[in-house]
Amino acid sequence: MNRNRLTECVLPTVLFVDMNSFFASCEQQVNFWLRGRPVGVCVYTGRQGCVIAPSVEAKLRGVKTGMRLDEAMALCPDLVPVETHPSRYREFHVKIVAVLKKFSDDVVPKSIDEAVVDLTNYQLVYKDMRKVAQDIKQAIRRDVGDYMRCSIGIAPNVFLAKLASDVQKPDGLTVITPDTIDDVLRSLRLTDLPGIGRGMAARLEAGGIHTPLALRYASPDHLKAVCQSIIGWHWHLRLNFSGEVDLDSSGANKSMSAMRTISPEQRSTPERLEELLLSLCLTLERRMVRQQVFCQEMSFSCRYQSGKTYNYEVRFPEPRQDGPELYQIINQRLLTFQEAHRCEPVLNEHLRSMCVAVFRFIPTESVPLSLFSDTSRKDKLRQTLHDLKAKFGSDKLLRATELRDDPVYRDVIGFGNIKDL
């Protein structure tokens, strides 16, 4: 797919497929008794749990993503909490992408529940893009599951196609063309546009741009001045059918992070918190091995129930990929900090969340050999370990450090980028 077209394109040949209430729909697909009922997918189903994905029926009752489970149950007493099954969602994702690739080779998954289908090079094959979208909906219901629904937006570029996919939910189909775009924008707020949050909306309003329609007709120079960056010019291009600019066309990760909100059970003992920290480091190891990269920097941060935070960053003298090594580096830093300042443990019962991030990657083949130690055998063993896990299952071969009678860490999956699924 050409992500950097700068020529004018007004034909609606780009489809943005957005699966409706994806996690909950997967659960309803495999469990007939959940169909038609308000469902809330949660990582933990205790009172302090959080609804990460409400079903269509739950959304109609006012349940929102991120709502605490007890609040959701008070709002919707017949809500059915269901524990998340990440491997199941990955399987459905793979099946959906396989269906989309029957219509075009130019398919780019944008997240676990979204994908772009570019039909620009298929205009001799497909005469009616709306008919193609309807055929995609039918194919997903037939080949993936009869309870799986999606909203599809059709437009000349990805930005507008994504915008169109949000206009009508669930099971919607909206086409944006030069003749219809003003009507679509007229019904929206600035924050309804992809990439515009409250902060950017406030900046635009301060510059006299209060609506998406005003954003479309603002001059590129004014937009660049208001936004204080080139992003204003990009919005002008997209809203005026002048091109598609993807700022991250390389497909490479700039960073990877593993983060968890910590339940009362997880913070009950220091050992449980240390186990969670190790699990986060092992998650990053798996992702780096899969992407065939080593990191040169790492950060660790945690937030407490009081709102206080602790942050730590380190630059490595040699690139790292090994999860237990990352864990040891963080753990040693915490011990040094606690001894130097004679304070309570950083990992304590008041923790609310914990995050480990790695960045500044270099390809595996570019990692320089160490003058003081031969790590090549260890690196090859790590690669072999993850190859076997990928082939036979993540629980079929474990390190001693991964063995737990009652694991505190549960696999989860987000709605964002799918590079590290």
Q: Which residues are covered by each model-predicted region?
A:
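A short glycine-rich, hydrophobically flanked beta-strand micro-motif that places a catalytic Asp/Glu
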Residues: 150-154, 295-299, 354
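Hydrophobic, well-ordered secondary-structure elements that form the walls
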Residues: 300, 356, 393
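C-terminal hydrophobic structural anchor segments
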Residues: 321, 325-390
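Short small-residue beta-strand/loop micro-motif enriched in glycine and branched aliphatics
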Residues: 81, 308-313, 365-368
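Short, charged/polar surface micro-motifs in flexible loops or helix N-caps
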Residues: 22, 45-48, 305-309, 361-364
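DNA-contacting surface of Y-family translesion DNA polymerases
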Residues: 7, 16, 205-348
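Gly/Gly-Pro- and Ser/Thr-rich, intrinsically disordered tail segments characteristic of DNA damage-repair
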Residues: 1-240, 247, 286, 368, ...
